Amino acid sequence: MPPISPHAVSTLSGEDGIPKYQIDLSLPPEERYLLLAKDFSTRMQEVVPLFDEVLETLVSSAILRRLLHFLARIFLWRLYSSEETRELKGIARAANIDLYYLVALNAALDGLLGCTSGGVVVKPSWGKEREERMMHFRTLDWGMDRLRGLVVVLEFVRSADDPGVVVARSVTYAGFLGVLTGVRENLSISLNFRGSHSCSTISLRFHQLLVLLGLQPPTATRLRTALLCPKPVLSLLTLATNLSNTKTSPCYIILCDSIETVIIQKDLTHGTKRCSNQFVACTNHDQYDERGADDGVKSNLYPKANLAGMEIVLEESEERYSCIRDKWTRYAQKKAGKQKTEWLAVGEKTLKNWIQEYPIMNECTNFVCLLDPKMGQIRWLERGWVVSDSDGDDGS
């Protein structure tokens, strides 16, 4: 048996502990995730049937599904990034999983996540830095429970430079190489699924096919590049502008530098930005201002649902957004008469209570966290609820 690595530790106590792994970017890509892959091999193998479950919802014919499996083995052998492809091959060998399953996970996962993200000025309750600053709150929802067991924290280091310095941190899934939720000093990032698009549906599907075949990078790979860049972080506005003009699947990208939070509403080739230095939030539906609501232009610019049955997802998204927005509005109104300054800060405990309340946190939530870009840290992290089939069953 391999020795237990000192780099694998639990961030939480008890059975709900979320493992933490150190990923050394100075190692050859094939070797970076070996310990994680060996530790999670059984759980990752248990997730493989998700591929078939998703196929069954999309394709009713068993013969056609077998054909798609055959084609997947042939064509899903790489990601766009050669570095990530090498990392993924190392994981596949160590975990004893067919590579095409991991390629499919990395190419498609970031397009199927329900999330609540945003930024708000927080009054820290502990730590050396007690100054009020913007922090980045985040819940990540996924309807398939088997992924819950793959949640991990990654701490990235470059041992060739300084093995004691963590250059970035990420909350992700074992076997997933892009960035869904991450933080480094002066930058935090999260990615939310967008339930609609304004671009041509044909253009979008073609782009998604290219991502699946490894001919275009997934959005999460582009965010990984921003998070792990060895150079100093770009200004928030510059990074937001660059990402807005980058080709990605429709999504929301949330960026925070402790001073300001920017939400990018991305379509295929362009994006629009919302910014705030007080409070801003995003779920999985578009936010419209009154000016654009009645401009009479509805043709190709009118958002279309990404997938059939998306109406329910968008309704739940609106409920989550209304909940967090209303909490901030009531808080601001309550404080308005007590504070002469326009600058408002929410207590850290209050914010945690907000984002743990239903429906912001719900039965599909895999984890909830608070990122501190000022310090480059994951300030708080907890697993989501685990709802058993017997909940609410009184035997009657």
Regions found by a protein language model. Give the residues of each.
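C-terminus-biased signal that marks the final domain/tail of proteins
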Residues: 1-123, 127-129, 221-396
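A contiguous strand-loop segment
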Residues: 54, 58-63, 79-220, 250
